[in-house]
């Protein structure tokens, strides 16, 4: 088996084991079985994408990323596996060339036309102009591990209910309900300000 095949197997197994752990914590043995089955359905195509796309470079950094994604950052990896699976079911294409050695899976189309979205190690809709920004989100997930998605979610809630960003001098103008989120909340949550 090739090194990328091993990486794909490791990532897929990590997602399944995370499903067992999360399911077991929430629902005992039955929950663990459900977690294995549900996340297993996403782990298989995700692991294949990691292997086929040769996502991890064969150097020390690539190995370190693979280890982090299978351990400390496994909640983000599992969320990314689900995200990848849903995108593939809706016809999105895996760009294998751009994935190779990048440390992230590159999907061609985004969720929303003019935006890229990254969950875990899966980037949807990125391009050469904004890819550095999206890779910062992948880095943030690896750095903060199990705290990352919770921190991002909580910051979105706080920024929506308590719009602290209205105090910023260089903020975008709010022109309506949609603009409140697109021009107010979204660009002013911590992970976007950093990226």
Language-model segments: what does each one mean?
Residues 2-16, 20, 60-88, 92, ...:
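Metalloprotease/metallohydrolase-associated module, dominated by Zn2+-dependent proteases
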Residues 49-61:
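Transmembrane alpha-helical segments that serve as helix-helix packing and pore/cofactor-lining elements
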Residues 135-154:
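Catalytic Zn2+-binding segment of zinc metalloproteases
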Residues 36, 44, 90-96:
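A generic short-segment signal for beta-strand/edge and adjacent turn/coil regions
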Residues 1-52:
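Transmembrane alpha-helices
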Residues 100-129, 141:
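Active-site scaffold of zinc-dependent metalloenzymes
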């Amino acid at each position: 088996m090739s090194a990328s095949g091993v990486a794909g197997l490791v990532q897929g197994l990590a997602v399944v084991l995370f499903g067992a752990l999360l399911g077991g914590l929430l629902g005992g043995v039955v929950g663990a079985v459900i977690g294995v089955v549900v996340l297993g359905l996403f782990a298989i195509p995700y692991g294949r994408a990691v292997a086929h796309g040769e996502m991890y470079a064969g150097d020390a950094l690539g190995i370190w990323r693979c280890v982090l994604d299978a351990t400390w950052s496994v909640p983000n990896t599992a969320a990314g596996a689900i995200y990848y699976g849903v995108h593939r079911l809706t016809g999105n294409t895996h760009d294998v060339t751009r994935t190779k050695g990048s440390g992230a899976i590159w999907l061609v189309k985004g969720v929303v036309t003019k935006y890229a979205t990254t969950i875990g190690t899966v980037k949807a809709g990125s391009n050469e102009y904004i890819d550095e920004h999206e890779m910062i989100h992948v880095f943030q997930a690896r750095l903060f591990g199990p705290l990352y998605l919770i921190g991002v979610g909580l910051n979105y809630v706080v920024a929506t209910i308590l719009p602290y960003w209205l105090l910023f001098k260089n903020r975008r103008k709010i022109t309506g309900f949609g603009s409140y989120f697109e021009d107010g909340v979204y660009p002013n949550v911590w992970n976007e300000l950093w990226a």
